[in-house]
Amino acid sequence: MNPQESAQGTWEQESPRTALDVVYIEWHVHPFRAERWFEIWEPGAARAMAFGAKGWSLTRNVEDPLHFRQASVWEIRDDFERYWYSDEVSALREEAVNYYNKPLLPVWHVLIAGE
């Protein structure tokens, strides 16, 4: 990257074949339902590994304890689609449907730095 590109905030992306993708899902849980939602959903989030995820996490917002963020890292986006729409994960979402606000919109990021 030349200095002019750096000053403009542009950067060169890795080839799509070597870059990892991170998908975030923002869960907004109904009051008094967070613990039950977590009991239902945590096994579903963990199932991402069985579908090819390189890692996953669930975090809870300190300032808004009803806001959870699910993150998972993927080499192949289609693997996330297989995970998200699998019978098992779909059933868990259905079981938890009364505990969170809809819709859920996965948002993709490209991992550009990290360990």
Question: Which functions belong to the PLM regions below?
Answer:
Residues L20, P31, F38-E42, A71-V73, ...:
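Generic alpha-helical hydrophobic packing signal
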Residues M49, I76, F80-Y99:
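Anionic, Ser/Thr-rich low-complexity intrinsically disordered regions
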Residues F38, A46, R82-W84, K102, ...:
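A beta-strand edge to alpha-helix "cap/lid" segment located at domain peripheries
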Residues R33-G55, E88-L92:
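Short amphipathic alpha-helical segments
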